[in-house]
């Protein structure tokens, strides 16, 4: 889904990670935050919006559970896309002494502390 979405906007992803965004207030929906590093430095907001819409559509099409949670505002809002400059993930991995060797950027981060650390490093402050 991520690659298809990048192809739609003519961009190439070098790294990405996704984690959950918990509701902050009563009645809010949760969702997922995709932190994405493109090889290109000129990805526009319009392209990011298209990337997010395509990603959401691909996930709905290919994942019945996701589709059920996205239907009629039940449980999940559309994915939030946060793009970061090239080299951002390498800097984060280096900061954690995880750059190189067998270490890879985790794609799906279920550890809330680790995801909070990544968001903080990348400059994304919301839950």
What residue spans do the PLM features occupy?
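AMP-binding adenylation
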Residues: 1-127
């Amino acid at each position: 889904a991520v690659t298809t979405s990048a192809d739609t906007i003519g961009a190439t992803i070098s790294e990405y990670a996704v984690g959950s965004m918990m509701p902050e207030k009563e009645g809010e929906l949760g969702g997922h935050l995709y932190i994405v590093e493109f090889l290109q430095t000129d990805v526009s907001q319009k392209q990011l919006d298209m990337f997010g819409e395509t990603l959401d559509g691909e996930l709905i099409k290919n994942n019945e559970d996701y589709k059920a949670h996205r239907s009629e505002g039940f449980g999940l809002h559309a994915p939030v896309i946060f793009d970061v400059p090239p080299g951002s993930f390498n800097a984060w991995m280096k900061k954690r002494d995880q750059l190189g060797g067998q270490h890879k950027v985790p794609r799906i981060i279920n550890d809330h502390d680790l995801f909070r650390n990544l968001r903080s490093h990348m400059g994304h402050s919301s839950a």
